[in-house]
Amino acid sequence: MPDSPTLHHNHIIGLENGSLTSNNNHQGMASVSVGQFQYPIWSWLNSLADATFGKRPSSFEFIVNKTRFSSAPVVATIIISYYLLILVGGRIMRNRQPIRLQKIFQYYNLTFSIASAILALLIFEQVAPAIYKHGFFFSICNEKAWTQPLVFLYYCAYISKFLELTDTFFLVLRKKPLQFLHCYHHGATAVLVYTQIVGRTSISWLIIEINLLVHVTMYYYYYLVAKGIRVPWKKWVTRFQIVQFFADLGFIYFAVYTEVAYRLKFYKACMGHCSGHPLAAFCGLATISSYLVLFIVFYHNTYKKNAALKMKAKAAAATKGNSSESSKNADLKRLSKSNASIAEVKCNNIVTNLYPISSGLNNEK
């Protein structure tokens, strides 16, 4: 069994001639061949980026403290600023009219839905050949699965988490209520993705891929709502997110288990070494576990609790209606009896008036 590898943050794997090969300009692991697979979407992206910006994604390198947004102080500053701006923005908008921003919000959500779909396809295109050639465990645990194209795509997903912070500012400007879950989730996710890139966890592609698929659905839902379209499957968006966290935790716990068993030399009880820094694994477990709890509470309060309250209100209304109907029937009965008594008195008066002699005789007797 090989020893656990030392982490080299500046190691890059390159893509050459349709195979995954090691870049000789960097130290690190050996190459891994997946055959002559074609990567049409990746090739298209390189051509587009080259024509537009004069740079190709295939030349990207992620180096801690050198690449933009790759240092911990910068990340911390952005997240702290995000929370401070929420507080300041709320105070500024307190006595102001809400800003609608309806069209901008529509395009924003549609753009994120489409971008998430494209990024998910790009990641799948890179991972599928490795799974086909070497198996699923290789793709989530082997250090050779940490390739240059995937690093670039992870970095794109990472940057998108900072862009998604603008969700909150839309809500502030529109004077919509902000929930703790929303603000916490946005800030924590940016930090989480940062820890995974720095920690070089090979399982990252799976967690990010699932998240992107959720975002395709979620942002499309928000797009429809922003257009004023009534969407009946809102509840399923939250359910999809909860399923995502269960899946994430299942895969991460498996990876952590097999790595711990490997380090303890219980080789028969594990599938081998799982690459990545232990701190990154801990951050993943802690953060996603907190998401799962918060989303389940949100789901219960929003759907289950509200549904129970609606049922209770409906039952109370029905009981009140039945009580009102019973009271109405009782009133009708009393009125009917009263009318009958009045009719009887009138009838007696008529008889007395028609037969006064008879009445007098009766009185004399």
Swiss-Prot record:
Spans traversing the lipid bilayer: 69-89, 112-132, 150-170, 180-198, 205-225, 242-262, 279-299
Reactions catalysed according to its record: a very-long-chain acyl-CoA + malonyl-CoA + H(+) = a very-long-chain 3-oxoacyl-CoA + CO2 + CoA
Lumenal side: 1-68, 133-149, 199-204, 263-278
Database matches in InterPro entries: ELO_fam
Topology Cytoplasmic: residue spans: 90-111, 171-179, 226-241, 300-365
UniProt GO MF annotations: fatty acid elongase activity
Keyword presence, Transmembrane helix: yes
EC number: 2.3.1.199
Gene Ontology BP term (one): fatty acid elongation, polyunsaturated fatty acid
Family recorded in the similarity comment: Belongs to the ELO family.
Protein name: Putative fatty acid elongase 2
Annotated source species: Schizosaccharomyces pombe (strain 972 / ATCC 24843)
